[in-house]
Swiss-Prot record:
Induction: Reduced oxygen levels. It catalyses: glycine + 2 A = hydrogen cyanide + 2 AH2 + CO2. Oxygen is necessary for cyanogenesis. Activated by succinate, glycine methyl ester, glucose and D,L-methionine in addition to glycine. Phenazine methosulfate, methylene blue, 2,6-dichlorophenolindophenol (DCIP) and ferricyanide can replace oxygen for the reaction. Inhibited by pyrrolnitrin and acriflavine at 1 mM concentration. It is an enzyme of class 1 (oxidoreductase). It comes from Pseudomonas aeruginosa (strain ATCC 15692 / DSM 22644 / CIP 104116 / JCM 14847 / LMG 12228 / 1C / PRS 101 / PAO1). Keywords: Cell membrane, Membrane, Oxidoreductase. One of its GO terms (cellular component) is plasma membrane. This is Hydrogen cyanide synthase subunit HcnB.
Length: 464
């Protein structure tokens, strides 16, 4: 049986890998959950007639080039959109297709480019309508779906804050202010590291200039204390943060807003890599990530990782990782000479090193303060699926819980349909702070990774 490589995830990494394979005449299957490829970075507007000019000329050029390259290789890429991989093992995947039919799909090689999800940071009022995660709001703007009405406030930490503020304003949204939790001096200390990517550094300065020119205030060392409103968001309380992100409540002030977008970084989606039994480790920030080598190979050599699965470093790094993974697959299939594969890999790795140095600087200045876990009050819901509060978690800690598995058993946190995607970040942070240990475990995924209808089992079969 002549099996094909399978790529899970049609974002930057998955598309780059598929293009690389296709250019060598190797056909592949590419699965993506969305209705068009591109991922969060390059999906573009979902509706016809939407002009993405507000996202910037350089972004538009990169989007158009990626689409042209992908279209040119379409004859070798079996693109399966609106399809979810809900489980798998070392030889096959379980896929729910667009018609909600379940299939087993076997593969010769597998590339996991499943991306990431946003880190949720609970605080009083974070479940109010009008409060949303920053990446989700940006995706709505990029997709041309909907724009928030009224005043929008942006809070959190990282380079995504000013970027989204500029994109929102350019799209016609009223941005009331941007609140960056880290102090300006902390960011300035990383200037040399940030200069490893001069264009991105200049883009950052340009965004700051845009905000100033358009009268959008940017507050360093400030963050959210509480969101409030009767049934929906009407007001956000912000305050100065100290180095540990402890809010100075004496100097807190209310800000009127109908939308609050909060962004505190991302966590790789490791549900499938865990089901496949790959080796994992923990990042400095405490999240679980699958391990890979310089060929993007996991602990199982025919399974590769790219994009956020291999480290959260942005779209450019994701594409480089996808290309390296494709070179490894081509090498294993004897579709490329070893010397050429190594030469091209080294060229890609040289570019990747500069990105890694840049990202290391970003990670240092955006490192979350230890007191962030104390923003939530005793009655603040942490696990939205099971309505587990911070008080429930604190009682479990008092009773001697030492790891994620114990916390899940004691409180039901992480037992809902999202399988902990919303609460795992907080639970891990709180356990690490309480126990003083870096490794407190992680939530083990169940099959299926996503909910599926019973009707999906009617036509279950195996597809090569």
């Amino acid at each position: 049986m002549n099996l094909r490589p399978v790529i899970v995830g049609g974002g930057s990494a998955g598309m780059a890998a598929a293009i690389e394979l296709a250019r060598r005449g190797v056909p592949c299957v590419l699965f993506d959950e969305a209705s068009r490829p591109g991922g969060v970075v390059y999906r573009g507007p979902l509706r016809a007639g939407v002009d993405p000019a507000y996202l910037g000329a350089r972004y538009t050029r990169m989007l158009e080039k990626l689409r042209r390259d992908f279209s040119a290789c379409a004859g070798h890429i079996d693109l399966r959109l609106n399809s979810r991989v809900v489980g798998g093992d070392g030889q096959r995947l379980m896929v729910l297709d667009e018609a909600e039919r379940l299939h087993e799909v076997e593969y010769s090689h597998l590339l996991l480019a499943t991306g990431c999800h946003e880190r949720s940071v609970p605080f009083p009022g974070w479940t109010l309508p009008g409060v949303m995660l920053l990446g989700g709001l940006q995706l709505q703007i990029k997709s041309g779906v909907v724009k928030p009405l009224g005043d929008t406030l942006i809070a959190g930490s990282g380079p995504l804050l000013p970027l989204v503020a500029c994109q929102l304003h350019a799209a016609g949204v009223r941005v009331a202010g941007v609140y960056e939790a880290c102090a300006f001096g902390r960011m300035a200390r990383e200037s040399l590291a940030l200069l490893n990517k001069p264009q991105l550094f200049l883009d950052g300065l340009s965004m700051l200039g845009y905000l100033k020119l358009n009268g959008i205030p940017l507050h360093y060392g400030w963050g959210v204390v509480e969101a409030s409103g009767d049934g929906e968001l009407t007001e956000v309380t912000v305050a100065p943060y100290d180095e540990e992100w402890r809010p100075d409540l004496e100097n807190a002030r209310p800000v009127k807003a109908s939308t609050l977008a909060v962004g505190y970084g991302f966590i790789p989606r490791t549900q499938l890599s865990q089901q496949l039994g790959l080796e994992h480790g923990f990042s400095d920030d405490g999240y679980l990530r699958a391990e890979c080598n310089v060929w993007q190979q996991s602990s199982q050599p025919h399974i590769h990782l790219a994009g956020d699965m291999a480290g959260i470093r942005g779209g450019e790094a994701a594409m480089i990782g996808g290309r390296i993974a494709a070179l490894s697959i081509l090498l294993q299939r004897e579709a490329i000479a070893p010397a050429e594969a190594i030469e091209r890999r080294e060229s890609h790795l040289a570019r990747l090193e500069a990105i890694k140095r840049f990202r290391a600087g970003v990670e240092r200045y955006t490192q979350r303060g230890a007191r962030q876990v104390e923003l939530a009050r005793a009655d603040t819901v942490i696990c939205r699926c099971e309505q587990v509060t911070r008080g429930d978690i604190e009682r479990a800690l008092e009773q001697g819980v030492q790891d994620i598995a114990g916390l899940k058993m004691r409180t039901r946190a992480g037992m809902g349909d999202c399988q902990g995607r919303m609460c795992i970040g907080y639970c891990s942070d709180r356990l690490r702070r309480a126990t003083g240990r870096h490794d407190v475990g992680w939530l083990r995924p169940r099959f299926p990774i996503d909910p599926i209808p019973f009707s999906a089992f009617q036509n279950l079969g195996t597809e090569a």
